[in-house]
Amino acid sequence: MAEDRPRTGVLKWNVEKVAEALKISVEDVREYFTDGRRVSFLLERRICREVLRGKLAPTEGAGYDIVDSDGGRWEVRSISKDGVYFSPSYMVGSGRQFEKDGFLKKLSEIEGFILCDIESFPEIPFWIVTASDIISWWHSGELGVNSKISREKALRLLSK
């Protein structure tokens, strides 16, 4: 990662202008922007252009979201009211299960994660966390058995 890039920052939105532009209510804007499945599209694009100054992955199934200006691959993840997970997306959801080897393989293929606290919308703080940081958290037991942690735990780890 380029040293001139900040490791933290804040993405800001004007809720009223977004609501007006989309012709929806302010409440609907808040609901949309605090749903990680929905807002990820927008977060990936803003992080790509404003923070990593790179390009988006060629496809949704690429295994990463952004290629930075140095060629490093990054995942963008939302810290929602339900927390955040670090395992590959194919391990998350109904009927799917965590697999340690796939998790560690994923970490070997990316530079790390950009974690966005969507619960703080309209000013969403983000943190750039390297894969080696995640591996350290894993080995110290901070990520539990399936690499999903609560929002509170994520914010505590990020504040260290």
Predicted segments with their positions:
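Nucleic-acid endonuclease domains
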Residues: 1-160
